[in-house]
Amino acid sequence: MPTTLRSLTLLAALAAALPAAAAEIVPPIDERFAAELTAAAEQPDFRRHVVPLLGRLGCNGRACHGSFQGQGGFMLSLFGYDFKADHANLMGGDEPRTNLAEPAKSLILAKPLEEVDHDGGKRLDRGSWQHRVLLEWISQGAEPAAVAAASFERLELEPQEILATKPGDSWQLKAVAVWSDGTREDVTPLCRFQSNDDQVATIDETGLVTAAGPGDTHVVTFYDNGVVPVPVLFPVSTLASGSYPDVPTPTRIDELVVAKLRKLGIVPSDLCTDAEFLRRVALDLTGTLPTAAEVEAFMADPRPDKRDRKLDTLLASPGYAAWWATKFCDWTGNNLDRNQNNGPDNRPVATAAWYEWLRSRIAANLPYDEIVEGIVLARSRLDDESYEAYCERMSDYQQADFAQAFAAQPYLPYYWSRRSFQTPQERALGFAYTFLGVRIQCAECHKHPFDQWTKDDFARFQNFFTRVRHGESPDSKQEITAMLERLGVDPALRGNDRDKAVVKLLKEGSTVPYRETFVVAPPKPAPVRPAKGKGKEQPRKPEKILVGRTATVLGGDEQQIDKLGDPREVLMDWMRDEENPYFARAIVNRVWAAYFNVGIVEPPDDLSLANPPSNEALLDHLAEEFRQHNFDLKWLHRTIISSRTYQTSWHTTDTNRLDERNFSRAVPRRIPAEVALDAIRMATAADADAGTMAASADGRAVAEATAVGWGQSGKYALAVFGRSARESNCDCDRSMEPSLLQTVFLQNDRDMLAQIERQGGWVEAVSSPYEAAKVEADRAAVGKARTAERLVAQAKRRLEKLKERGVEGKALAQAEAALAAARRTAPGDQPPAVSPAASPAAAPAPADVARIVRQAYLRTLSRPPTEAEASRATSYFSETASVREAARDLLWALLNTKEFLVNH
């Protein structure tokens, strides 16, 4: 019987009497090869059976022959994605793994049987079904995967959800592969399995799931290009069995969250207090600490809809657009060190313009897809704009406020001009991270271990970016040369030297040349021309820059791009398509993660099949509604924040103490670096200055500035608190973890202490009515002491230099005398003396002390003190020498509490 017919005999017999849509499931291969084989045995299929079996045995894993260099002179593609290469490696080489003449002596059998030396140990038992499958495949010719064979469509799993009741409960997964010819085969014995949390459920190599402990996770099944997760839920209490309490669900978000909590027996926390809500939403939405006056007013407001009103106010505030523009800068990679000098618009200018371009659109509530379109389709020139007109426009921007003027143009070309974003590979990786929330790095070299992407998928996807260029476009080189000649720029100058000359001319008001982001024309067929001295026509040599004629969106069909002016248009259309599985989900998940400490998919930038959502119905709902509301970002923020789920307390119930992924309570989390610095500055500022900061984003760290109020120490402080480095395609560039260095900074850093004691700050404002003269005297004494310390340091350095040079005699004696004199004027360990003329400080009334204490709590923790806290703080004031000292110490102590640095 011919091998192609023999291999289909079993499948045809099972499906002959049934329509394709109702084809029976082919029994698993371990049953079909359980007994001794006969002459009529089916031929195992290389793609459907042999390669998955090698994966199941561990042969093509990363620790074995699937590593990038193989093992023992034999290599397989990682997890078996390259069927052609795998077949060639099995059949060829100096030591073929298959022996068609004597199949039983094939190395692919002998080594895993350990009949010959094998570093991987024993993987097969003689006579097992696995042994029979491989032996039969070789015996029948070791055929490769047929080019015209049916393609893999999907993997179906049963059960689709597992609900455990006690440890030790078990379930057998059943995996069915569905092929394009209608074949449905039970491939459970050929699958690989993993549990995402062994503390909740384990899964063995046969697909047997066993409950381990309370919680929820997924078990994931891998076969061919299929990756399918199955949720496992193990209730944490008996409430899941029918005694679950009546929990309010005023919004659809709440309904979907509580639906899962009910299965887990988790009761959500109560609503947070008004003070907690105000602090939480102000920090989350605007990156701004509420002022003391704002907290007082909100708590006193009797209107039942005051939370919704406050939300609307915050969405209209400058802080909202500033803070979320900074987040978008994180995701799009606005990195000062990696932006290129584009000629006159240097890196700092480009960085500020990038931020302002995003901020202005977020403030105007431009739909998210339109913001993205301005980035994805970005080029430097406007429609039908000549190169000279482009240079005139950019030069005019420089004469005004460049960032403001630049923000008015429709595109953001700086996204494409970054130094770390120039190759098609870099762009494919960065694009997938920024707009799709997908990590495809693995697929650059091999099959993604936790997703469907292959190396071929990556190569086809990167073709969308091969024609995007940054620099001098081919059609503008002559104009650039002519412009430089008119300007009198030395033609011998290159690079930075030429840029310096151009910048000088720009400052004088001249129109100067600019580099640009552009898209090269699609490739043309090579023209035919006669060869010299011959009568035959020869095609021209291809251009040096080769560009792809086709490209493929992730998980989609191949697209013809050689006739498109800009291949990126296909990507934009695909992302807007309502069937796109990534675009809306990625931004919805990132916004959700900003509010709940974790995403519905966590990490938020890893939307892979093996990393499924903790609540898929919730993510699907939000993504679909976001699309239906025309990608309205303010709608998204308002919808999430208005939910009861967002407004739950951080105080736990008996059932949700350990829950951090199902949104049953607010999870306290450290505030981001920029927010922390602004909060410190606002908390230490006088009331008027704090109000100004709250009403404006100017000079704020959340506004992409360098923390103006912190002077030169701003960058260091931002680094201490984990500001995003924007160096890689990973949300992990921003650190939200607490550290010892942060504690040291808050307690002892010179600039931190200077914020508390600064002139015009809150401490001075509340203490000055009681000790104005004393403050001036103390300030003078401190200034005198610092001058003396500086003189001592100078004298010591001079003396040390003289000794190093070997100077002796009179000069050395004079230096020693100068040092001694300076030391006599230094304060040493004694406190600075206060002028006798200074009037004594007036004692504040008890009501004044209570007011100061209350204000300190409101401006730092956004709540009044408890009775115990107020009593303790008031007592400290009575025990301390001055109001200034007591207020300073109280403010310092509050800034060093966990409650201040945590959003809850």
Regions found by a protein language model. Name each.
Residues L124-P144, E737-G760:
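Catalytic cores of secreted or luminal carbohydrate-active enzymes
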Residues A23-H131, A149-V176, R184-P250, R280, ...:
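Solvent-exposed helix-loop boundary motif
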Residues P245-G319, W324, D330-G699, D731-R734, ...:
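Primarily short, surface-exposed interaction patches in extracytoplasmic proteins
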